[in-house]
């Protein structure tokens, strides 16, 4: 699909990429559709991306793609089905970057991190200083969002497995941006983890996008 990064008239050459292609093996069902505050987990991630200064947004789907696309409000994001999703997160990342190849940079988030703050996205964008990648950290631990500059795209399209992209980042200049005060770095991999997020109260920060 040849769609400009600034699609929709957005003023940013930065694209948004939400990875949501996993099979939810540990969860036991399509966790992208599990509800938090009455909204599917994936929709929280998409709403958050839409509140940031970003142009085109792509969401990568794989397992259960048709059902997910029919039940989740994508908030203007373009769905891309990655045929290689079973090869791991790196394959999904490669599929998404191929769709956003004309962007000067791409901000990556995950579809199972509903509490990632829009301010975390703004913070990593504001931190651009020539580093190949900029990522949020929580209590010193690397997390998302991660901003990838265009110079990394080609190399990232060649990595494999769930750890491939992380290993590549070990070899380039990465700027870590502390986001401890914003919270939201938790993945939802199990039903117990979802219950724990529910117990913390409503998700805040990402206003609904009309």
Question: Which residues does each predicted region cover?
Answer:
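Nucleotide and nucleotide-moiety/phosphate-recognizing core
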Residues: 8-142, 150, 171-180
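Conserved alpha/beta core of the MobA/IspD/sugar-nucleotide pyrophosphorylase nucleotidyltransferase superfamily
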Residues: 1-12, 154, 158-210
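Conserved nucleotide-sugar donor-binding
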Residues: 143-154, 191
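A residue-level structural signature of the nucleotidyltransferase/glycosyltransferase Rossmann-like core
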Residues: 113, 144-147, 157, 185-186
């Amino acid at each position: 699909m040849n769609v400009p990064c600034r699609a929709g008239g957005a003023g940013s050459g930065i694209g948004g990429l939400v990875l949501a292609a996993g099979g939810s093996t540990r969860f036991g069902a399509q966790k992208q559709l599990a509800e938090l505050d009455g909204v599917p987990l994936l929709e929280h991630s998409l709403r958050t991306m839409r509140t940031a200064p970003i142009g085109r947004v792509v969401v990568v789907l794989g397992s259960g793609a048709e059902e997910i696309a029919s039940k989740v409000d994508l908030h203007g994001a373009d769905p891309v089905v990655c045929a290689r999703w079973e090869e791991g997160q790196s394959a999904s990342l490669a599929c998404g970057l191929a769709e956003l190849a004309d962007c000067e940079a791409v901000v990556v988030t995950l579809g199972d991190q509903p509490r990632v703050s829009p301010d975390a996205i703004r913070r990593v964008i504001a931190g651009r200083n020539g580093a190949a990648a900029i990522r949020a950290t929580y209590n010193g631990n690397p997390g998302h969002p991660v901003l990838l500059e265009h110079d990394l795209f080609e190399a990232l399209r060649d990595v494999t497995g769930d750890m491939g992209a992380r290993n590549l980042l070990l070899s380039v200049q990465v700027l870590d941006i502390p986001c401890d005060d914003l919270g939201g770095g938790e993945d939802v991999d199990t039903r117990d983890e979802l219950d724990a997020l529910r117990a913390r109260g409503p998700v805040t920060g990402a206003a609904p996008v009309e």
